[in-house]
Amino acid sequence: MSRELHDVDLAEVKPLVEKGESITGLLQEFDVQEQDIETLHGSLHVTLCGTPKGNRPVILTYHDIGMNHKTCYNPLFNSEDMQEITQHFAVCHVDAPGQQDGAPSFPVGYMYPSMDQLAEMLPGVLHQFGLKSVIGMGTGAGAYILTRFALNNPEMVEGLVLMNVNPCAEGWMDWAASKISGWTQALPDMVVSHLFGKEEIHNNVEVVHTYRQHILNDMNPSNLHLFISAYNSRRDLEIERPMPGTHTVTLQCPALLVVGDNSPAVDAVVECNSKLDPTKTTLLKMADCGGLPQISQPAKLAEAFKYFVQGMGYMPSASMTRLMRSRTASGSSVTSLEGTRSRSHTSEGPRSRSHTSEGSRSRSHTSEDARLNITPNSGATGNNAGPKSMEVSC
């Protein structure tokens, strides 16, 4: 009996963004609570997705300027790769005052909270939902706010994923430039130049146009201007890399710093990495990625996030990712985000460490779609024992 061969269409069953779908598409189906929570410095619009599980932390997100939690994080949390993670953790999305969809304008004379005050509002959110601790995920301004929150309340923060974080106050040259650009540049253009690198603006016209339209049509312009002004008036976080025998201000929790290699925030993130505890910090540089890695490469970011929480002791039985499987099949040792690894530093001088007992660990896998190169940052102490912070390129 002869059998005919038929073409089978293996197109994606549910694309990340359907044609014509709004950028603020719905999250996956969860029990969702939306509340306006009164805090020490005013009201916050908060969305809790899922049910907190016992003593397990909740993922708490904070967005960047020109965005809200939907435009900043929906593509990531809607992605297939995040589904396993959100089965283990509830997610609490915080919108900065006046940045949520449909937000009314603040009255004339309203004093918008400073960045420090925005961080001081977060304990009230945890108390409202009965949460003991969180794993923070912040982008840009949101990353700064969550870092300040962790510095003020280390007992409430078990870990931080910080995208495009800038730990420094805006210099007077930057301040002057922002004032001048405010006179000559439309608000959407100012935000776009903050979110995207020049190359990305030129090459990803459709994505940039989508966000420009979101800023024009969905954001309250007066409220957005207040949030931008607060971010441009931020203080230096005044964090320092800890040294033996000294007392320094730094994060006490594990931190994953994330930046695209074409992001306008690369230098700021590298600067932040140099100020944190090298035994608790990982720097993830995403190749061929611009200013919004959670939008352009959600699968890679979800994978890195899974490694991160596994390093914290959660999700030990999580399934192996595509990258882990491909590396195992190729015969290479599987790398994690914890422990010592050899690396060369281009910015801090050569610090390659030989590990003769472990043999050669070649990290080049040109046959694979994704590469994960992990190497320790300088501990700045001269002591080679113990774990070092990592720099990851993927």
UniProtKB/Swiss-Prot annotation:
Q: Where in the cell is it found?
A: Cytoplasm, Cytosol; Cytoplasm, Cytoskeleton, Microtubule organizing center, Centrosome; Nucleus; Cell membrane
Spell out the subunit comment: Interacts with RAB4A (membrane-bound form); the interaction involves NDRG1 in vesicular recycling of CDH1. Interacts with APOA1, APOA2, PRA1 and RTN1.
Q: What happens when the gene is disrupted?
A: Mutant mice exhibit defects in peripheral nerve development. Initial hind limb weakness developed around age 12 weeks, and significant functional impairment (dragging of hind legs) and muscle atrophy became apparent at age 1 year. After about 5 weeks extensive demyelination of nerve fibers is observed. In later life, large inclusions were seen in the adaxonal Schwann cell cytoplasm. There is no evidence of apoptotic response.
The UniProt entry annotates sequence repeats at: 339-348, 349-358, 359-368
Taxonomically, the superkingdom here is Eukaryota
State which gene encodes it.
Answer: Ndrg1
Which stretches are tagged as biased composition: Basic and acidic residues?
Answer: 345-371
Segments for region (Disordered): 325-394
Q: Could you tell me what this protein is called?
A: Protein NDRG1
* Gene Ontology MF, one: gamma-tubulin binding
Stored Pfam families: Ndr
Which residues are recorded as modified (N-acetylserine)? S2
Q: Which GO terms describe its cellular component?
A: adherens junction; centrosome; cytoplasm; cytosol; microtubule; myelin sheath; nucleus; perinuclear region of cytoplasm
